[in-house]
Amino acid sequence: MFTYGNYISQYPFQIPIVLYYYLLILIFGKNYIAFQFVNVIFLVLIYYYLIKISSLISRNKKITIITLLLCISFISLQVYVMFLYSNIPSLFFTCAGIYYFLNHYHVNPIRNMMLSFVFLLCATLLKGTAYILLIAEIILYILEFIQTKNIKRILIVIISTIFIILSPDIANKTVSSLDSSIDLKTSTYKEIALVMGTSYGPRGAGWHNGWYEPYLYKQYGTNTDAMRKDGIKRTINNLNTLVHDHKLLDFYHDKICSMYINPDYQGFWTISANKAQQFGKGNPQAQSFLWITYDKENDIYSHFTSSFMTGKINQLIIFYENILMNVIYLGALCYILFNRKKMTTEKIFIPLIFIGCFLFFLLWEAKGQYSILFYILLFPLTAEGIEQLAKVIVNNRK
């Protein structure tokens, strides 16, 4: 796994999640259901922090209750607890980090700033997307310092920023000290992600295509400079080709829809893809979870599970979540419209995150499960938008 050309050398950012699951294995053995129950705990904490974020943004119990209802009603996030990857743990650390950032405007600013950085740093270790949140946070801290001239706060920002910048080198030296043959600087994933993010793949526009990394290692061996040059050249060629063929708008329409107009945000895909990547044999233990029963002999799910995953029950869930998705986006839009003239830093932070990530993923390799974070962060905004819209409707009827 750790040797050159293998998983970790290609994806060094996955080291923390590998170590995380090693830790779970040490505690629980290879009991995958125990891992999924850990995800359930994280899920409850995600709900908790989304509600806390809502209470900071609005300080209205009705809006907090609406946020809780939105959390519970999004079935696909509950499905994600079966997906043993970094998604659910990272969502927890991200929501906690955002809460402590917003809370530093109200009480114990230094303590909450430090907690926010710690939680978001943990989130970045598990999911690199959280770096965007850290950058947004640092920008707002700098703007705050310009207004307040608070030396203690800016010192925390400076120290944290330096640590974030140096963290890749720290990780590289730590891993290299364990095995001198490993050098994480040889990773070319940035270039690979840009190539895939600007080209069509078998799964979707801008998605991970599965062929480019093996091609690079076969073509260039250990010559990482040549790999990087190939990646940059292909990215430029991809964009030029899309423009020349008048397919740029079509490409980004497909990519954006697959990321943001995806009702279950790949919730069901993540737990079924392993079973039937090419409609072939799968590993039943990789997606079993209590009531999901699997017929090992015939390689089929039970009738209920099959209906839940791909049948009529699934169709009803997707239909319902499609309606929910429209409510979420419309509610968030109402929030922006109703608060446009009284936007404080607290109220603008989550929209700023959404916009920043949207722009980042225009070029970067992406798919629906990457954007689920930004989707659930809209819940507190949607709750306030719905409540404000209801007030307007009631007042107009009087």
Give the positions of each predicted feature.
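Short acidic/glycine- and proline-prone juxtamembrane loop motifs at membrane-interface regions
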Residues: V79-S90
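Transmembrane-helix signature of polytopic, membrane-embedded enzymes
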Residues: L50-S73, T345-I348
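Membrane-interface anchor segments at the N-terminal boundary of transmembrane helices
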Residues: A34, V38-N39, D254-F354
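Membrane-interface alpha helices of multi-pass inner-membrane proteins
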Residues: N112-K127, T161-S167, L359
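Membrane-proximal stem/loop segments at transmembrane-domain junctions that anchor or position
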Residues: F2-T3, S177-Y294
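Membrane-interface transmembrane helices that cradle and orient dolichyl/undecaprenyl
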Residues: C95-M113
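Transmembrane-helix motifs of polytopic, lipid-linked glycan transferases
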Residues: F37-S58, A96, G331-C334
